[in-house]
């Protein structure tokens, strides 16, 4: 099972390249809600928690790219199952950051790129997600990369996504969960109706049997008094 469910590289809110391995639409909606909240005034390495998902990202800053400030608006983001921890997702992020800058040098005009303007990188994203998310070798490479890049992933700030989003945005995130609950509720209602129908027929049969017994008793009494 893939434990890296969605990844993207964006310039501010413009998604340049993206890959989703999860059938759920919730993962991509998480990314679209997080990106507008990310500040690039200083470099950031941060994890947000949302249920069983963790949203990890590395946000560039113009201070890291003084000669190419456009690169300072980039965000490298991945959504992973919480069971994967943080070393593997951040190792993955450091690797895609390195490969992305190899394919698109810092001097590229990222601000002028349209949505999915770096879609040629999609295959690289998917390949790394599969490798780092499912293979022991890939996960070991990710951990080694994370150790090289950061001394201690526990130093990465972790926040709950609920504190980041406005109420309306939090409601948007419930849509996917509500759809699943709605399906379960419909199934429950169908089963409830079937159960009620069976109980009704059972009661009808019982009442019919009681009526027959009462009639037989009355008939017996009448015959005995003659």
Give the positions of each predicted feature.
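Extended N-terminal soluble domains of membrane/secretory-pathway proteins
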Residues: 1-138
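SNARE-motif-like long amphipathic alpha-helical rods in endomembrane trafficking proteins
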Residues: 120, 124-226
């Amino acid at each position: 099972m893939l434990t890296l469910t969605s990844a993207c590289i964006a310039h501010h809110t413009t998604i340049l390249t993206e890959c989703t391995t999860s059938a759920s639409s919730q993962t991509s909606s998480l990314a679209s809600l997080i990106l507008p909240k990310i500040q690039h005034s200083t470099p950031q390495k941060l994890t947000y928690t949302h249920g069983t998902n963790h949203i990890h990202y590395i946000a560039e800053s113009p201070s890291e790219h003084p000669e190419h400030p456009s690169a300072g608006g980039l965000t490298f983001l991945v959504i992973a199952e919480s069971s994967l921890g943080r070393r593997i997702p951040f190792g993955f992020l450091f690797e895609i950051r390195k490969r992305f800058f190899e394919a698109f040098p810092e001097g590229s005009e990222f601000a002028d790129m349209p949505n999915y303007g770096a879609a040629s990188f999609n295959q690289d994203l998917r390949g790394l997600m599969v490798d780092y998310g499912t293979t022991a070798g890939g996960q070991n490479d990710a951990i080694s990369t994370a150790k090289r890049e950061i001394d201690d992933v526990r130093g990465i700030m972790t926040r709950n996504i609920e504190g980041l989003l406005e109420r309306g945005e939090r409601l948007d995130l419930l849509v996917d969960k509500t759809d699943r609950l709605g399906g379960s509720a419909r199934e429950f209602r169908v089963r409830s109706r079937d159960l009620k129908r069976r109980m009704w027929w059972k009661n009808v049969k019982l009442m019919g049997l009681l009526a027959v017994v009462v009639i037989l008793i009355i008939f017996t009494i009448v015959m005995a008094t003659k």
